[in-house]
Amino acid sequence: MNKELQPKVIFLMGPTASGKTALALELAEKHNCEIISVDSALIYRGMDIGSAKPSADELARGPHRLIDIRDPSESYSAADFRADAITEIEQIISMGKTPVLVGGTMMYFKALLEGLSPLPSADEAIRAEIQAEADEKGWEALHDQLREIDPVSAERIHPNDPQRLSRALEVYRISGKSMTELTQTKSAPLPYDVVQFAIAPRERKVLHDLIAQRFAIMLKQGFLEEVTELKARGDLHLDLPSMRCVGYRQCWQYLDGEFDYDTMVEKAVAATRQLAKRQLTWLRSWPELNWLESGAEGNLVTLMRQCR
């Protein structure tokens, strides 16, 4: 179908603390748009302060889809996101509105835009079998196995990365095909006219300062108390994807007595800055991207002009 005849979908990407939410809310209020969150932390219930989840007032102004859809004990993959996001996009378009996908989880945006390889679902029995082999022989021996069946993945995956190494072996044992073979086939790309924007401060120091300021505000809002409540549940631990979110891990470790308060703040801010750096690295290599400067006047006008 000609792109001009396809329904329009807006991507608004950017590093953490860059002002994505404020611009998305303006879009929702003034231009018949609905917001879909693209954030691997906002999906979790009870993780509100440390994830910078939109406030009740902001959600009243512009409801966000795909937030608070999982318990922190649960996992959520890029494939899960793609399926859920496509459902939400189709609903919004059927209402005569424009979907605006807003967030900083670049892997989700990439999966949505380009499609995903048809990898098999996890098999707990096979995972346990691989773990038992690793306990007996060591991960180096399993890495040698991977090199024999999938040298391309073995080159990419380090022997000290058991999670990815285990997954590559699991995929082969389930399907009889290597990860490399399977990833050569992808699901269909999005059948929409996708207009893509990135928003970020021009100067890195500005972003670094915003990150430090925002973490200080989170602590005043009760971030440590939020993590204390999550710890008290008893079913969560630091190996879960939810607890690997920046800020949560460092607060958890502080509450465990691993380091003092000032060190916790320093580590959390540093981890958030590293996340922002990775996000910007993704974005700089992203094709067909329109850049906006955080806080600049006229961003909404510029965005709407590009969408025509």
Curated annotation (Swiss-Prot):
**Where does the chain bind ATP?**
14-21
| Enzyme class, UniProt record, top EC level | transferase
User: What InterPro entries does UniProt report for this protein, alphabetically?
Assistant: Dimethylallyltransferase, IPT, P-loop_NTPase
Write out the catalysed reaction. Answer: adenosine(37) in tRNA + dimethylallyl diphosphate = N(6)-dimethylallyladenosine(37) in tRNA + diphosphate
What GO molecular functions are on record for this protein?
ATP binding; tRNA dimethylallyltransferase activity
Q: Where is this site: Interaction with substrate tRNA?
A: 105, 127
**Region (Interaction with substrate tRNA) spans which residues?**
39-42, 163-167, 244-249
- Superkingdom: Bacteria
Q: Which Gene Ontology terms describe the biological processes this protein takes part in?
A: tRNA modification
Q: Pfam families, from UniProt?
A: IPPT
Q: Which cofactor does it need?
A: Mg(2+)
Residues recorded as binding substrate, renumbered to this chain, are 16-21
The reply to whether Transferase figures as a keyword in the UniProt entry is yes
Residue ranges of coiled coil? none
Task: State the UniProt keywords alphabetically.
Answer: ATP-binding, Magnesium, Nucleotide-binding, Transferase, tRNA processing
Indicate yes or no for the key word Transferase.
yes
Q: For this protein, what is the EC number?
A: 2.5.1.75
According to the record's subunit comment, the protein's assembly and interactions are: Monomer.
* Cited function: Catalyzes the transfer of a dimethylallyl group onto the adenine at position 37 in tRNAs that read codons beginning with uridine, leading to the formation of N6-(dimethylallyl)adenosine (i(6)A).
Family the UniProt entry places it in:
Belongs to the IPP transferase family.
**Mind telling me what this protein is named?**
tRNA dimethylallyltransferase
Organism annotation: Shewanella baltica (strain OS185)
